[in-house]
C-alpha cells in the first residue's frame, strides 16, 4: 500500500451517508451515488476545482478531502489522473513557484528551515534572513491597525476592489505610512497610493509563465513599450540599487538562471531547453537533453517523510455567516465572461464596456424577484451585515432560489463591500462564496439611475486626478 490513515478516514466518512448530506449539498442521494460510481469506475479520472471550493471557511479541508477521494480510487501517481486546481489567472502557479507566498522561498523551500534561510541569505549576499514567515494580504487591515505592517508595495493587484469587507481594507490602507502601486492602469488601489509606478503590459516584456500543470513556457515581447517605460524587474532592480542593495541584472535570463541554481526542481529548465521543447513541467533537475521534465507527480513515492500518502477528512462545519429573517439570501461572488477579474484592463476597453457597464448585476431567481417585486434590469439595493451597494437585477432561473450571484469587478456595484471577513484559519482566504444578504427594490428608478451616473462620474474623476498627481 502507498497510503496510511485509512481506518481513521473511514470512521468519519461513515457518518456522512448520501441521504444525510442531501440537505447540506442540495444534491439527491441518488445523484451522489451515481457520481461516485462514475468516478470510481473510470479507468482514469481527474478532479478539477476552482474558487467555489477554496473560497470557503473549510476550503483547505475540502481540497484535502478531494485528494483523499483520488487516493481511494487510485487516481494519483499515474498518467491522466490527479487533483488539479483551476488557477484564477495564467501565472498564479508561476507566482507561487517564485516564492510569492508568506512562508516559502522560490521553489517551495520553507522559511522555517534554517538550512533554507542560510542558503538564500548566502546567495543574496546578506548576513541573515528573518525566521518568521510573512503575512497574507487578507491580514493587512488588522496588521496595519496594530503597526505590524507599515507599508505596502502592490504590483498588478487591486485589493481595494477584490478583497473582502472593503470598508476594513480601506481603513487598513489609511493606517499605512506608505503605499506604492506598480501597474499598467489606474485602479481604486492606485488612487489611494502615495507613489504610482507605471509598468509594461504582458505584450511589452518577456519572461516565463508557469501553467497550472507545472509547465514552464517562455513568452516574448511583441511591441516596444512607449514613453521609455520600464519592466517590473527593471523597476525593482533600480529601487533596490538606490536603497543600497545593488541589483545589476542585464536581462531576464540572468534572473532565471539565478533562480534555477537556487531551486533544484527547476534547475534543468534552462532558457535554451525551453526554447527547444517549448514547454517543460517541473521537476526538471538536470540540464541534459535526457531530462525533459515530469509529466505527473508521485510515481514512486509521495512528498511525505515516509513516502506514503495520508488520508484526510474532517467533520463538516457550516459557513460562518448565518441566514436570518433580515438577511435570508446567500450571495456568492463569481466571475463571468465579458470582463476579466477586477476589470482594471478590460474596463478600459470601450467595446466591452458597451456590452456591460456600471453598476453591474445581481443575478437572482425568478421566484425571488416576483416575491420581492423586482423587475429584470431594475436597479436594486443589496445589503449585508457589512455594507450596502446599488446594482442592477438580472432575473432568470439560472440561480437557485435564495441565491444571489454577483461578479466582483464593478466599481459602483462592488459586491466585496458586502462580503464578511470570515477567514480560513489555515490560508486566511475569505469566505467569498457564502454571505448573508437581502435584496431591496427601489421605487424611484429615475433617481436611482441618476445616482449611479453621478457616482460613476465622481469615481472616474478621482482616478483621473490621482493619475495626474
Residue ranges and their predicted role:
Residues 1-42:
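Long, well-ordered, tryptophan-enriched scaffold segments
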Residues 24-27, 50-57, 89, 156-161, ...:
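Conserved short loop/turn motifs at secondary-structure junctions
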Residues 39-142, 213, 285-291, 300-308:
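A glycine-rich, hydrophobic/aromatic-adjacent loop/helix-cap motif
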Residues 45, 152, 179, 193-198:
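Short, well-ordered beta-strand core segments
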Residues 86, 93-102, 119, 254-351:
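Long, low-complexity segments enriched in small/aliphatic residues
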Residues 168, 175-178, 182-187, 221-241, ...:
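Phosphate/diphosphate-binding loops
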Residues 184-220, 410:
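Flexible glycine/proline-rich, aromatic-decorated loop/lid segments
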Residues 226-228, 232-280, 347-363, 367-469:
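Long, contiguous, secondary-structure-rich segments that constitute the structural scaffold
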Amino acid at each position: 500500500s502507498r497510503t496510511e490513515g485509512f481506518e481513521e478516514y473511514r470512521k468519519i466518512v461513515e457518518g456522512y451517508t448520501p441521504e444525510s448530506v442531501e440537505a447540506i449539498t442540495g444534491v439527491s442521494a441518488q445523484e451522489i451515488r451515481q457520481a461516485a460510481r462514475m468516478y470510481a469506475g473510470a479507468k482514469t479520472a481527474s478532479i478539477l476545482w476552482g474558487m467555489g471550493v477554496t473560497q470557503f471557511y473549510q476550503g483547505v479541508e475540502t481540497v484535502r478531502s478531494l485528494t483523499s477521494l483520488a487516493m481511494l480510487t487510485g487516481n494519483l501517481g499515474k498518467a491522466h489522473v490527479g487533483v488539479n486546481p483551476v488557477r484564477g489567472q495564467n501565472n498564479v502557479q508561476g507566482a507561487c513557484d517564485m516564492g510569492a507566498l508568506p512562508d516559502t522561498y522560490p521553489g517551495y523551500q520553507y522559511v522555517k528551515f534554517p538550512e533554507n534561510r542560510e542558503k538564500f541569505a548566502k546567495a543574496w549576499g546578506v548576513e541573515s534572513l528573518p525566521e518568521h514567515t510573512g503575512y497574507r494580504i487578507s491580514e493587512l487591515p488588522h496588521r496595519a491597525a496594530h503597526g505590524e505592517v507599515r507599508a505596502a508595495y502592490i504590483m498588478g493587484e487591486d485589493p481595494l476592489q477584490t478583497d473582502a469587507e472593503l470598508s476594513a481594507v480601506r481603513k487598513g490602507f489609511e493606517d499605512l505610512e506608505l503605499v506604492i502601486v506598480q501597474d499598467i492602469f489606474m485602479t481604486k488601489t492606485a488612487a489611494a497610493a502615495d507613489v504610482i509606478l507605471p509598468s509594461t503590459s504582458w505584450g511589452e516584456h518577456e519572461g516565463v509563465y508557469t501553467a497550472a500543470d507545472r509547465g514552464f513556457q517562455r513568452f516574448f515581447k511583441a511591441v516596444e513599450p512607449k514613453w521609455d517605460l520600464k519592466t517590473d524587474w527593471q523597476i525593482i532592480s533600480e529601487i533596490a540599487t538606490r536603497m543600497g542593495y545593488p541589483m545589476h541584472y542585464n536581462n531576464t535570463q540572468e534572473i532565471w538562471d539565478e533562480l534555477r541554481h537556487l531551486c533544484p526542481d527547476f534547475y534543468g529548465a534552462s532558457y535554451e531547453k525551453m526554447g527547444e521543447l517549448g514547454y517543460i513541467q517541473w521537476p526538471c533537475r538536470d540540464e541534459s537533453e535526457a531530462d525533459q521534465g515530469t509529466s505527473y507527480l508521485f510515481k514512486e513515492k509521495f512528498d511525505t517523510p515516509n513516502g506514503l500518502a495520508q488520508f484526510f477528512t474532517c467533520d463538516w462545519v457550516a459557513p460562518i455567516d448565518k441566514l436570518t429573517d433580515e438577511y435570508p439570501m446567500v450571495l456568492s461572488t463569481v466571475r463571468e465572461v465579458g470582463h476579466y477579474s477586477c476589470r482594471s484592463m478590460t474596463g478600459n476597453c470601450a467595446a466591452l464596456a458597451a456590452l456591460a457597464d456600471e453598476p453591474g448585476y445581481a443575478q437572482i431567481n425568478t421566484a425571488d424577484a416576483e416575491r420581492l417585486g423586482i423587475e429584470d434590469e431594475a436597479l436594486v439595493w443589496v445589503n449585508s451585515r457589512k455594507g450596502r451597494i446599488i446594482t442592477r437585477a438580472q432575473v432568470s432561473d439560472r440561480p437557485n432560489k435564495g441565491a444571489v450571484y454577483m461578479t466582483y469587478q464593478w466599481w459602483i456595484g462592488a459586491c466585496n463591500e458586502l462580503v464578511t471577513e470570515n477567514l480560513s484559519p489555515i490560508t486566511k482566504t475569505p469566505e467569498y462564496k457564502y454571505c448573508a444578504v437581502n435584496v431591496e427594490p427601489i421605487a424611484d428608478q429615475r433617481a436611482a439611475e441618476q445616482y449611479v451616473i453621478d457616482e460613476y462620474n465622481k469615481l472616474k474623476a478621482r482616478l483621473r486626478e490621482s493619475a495626474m498627481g
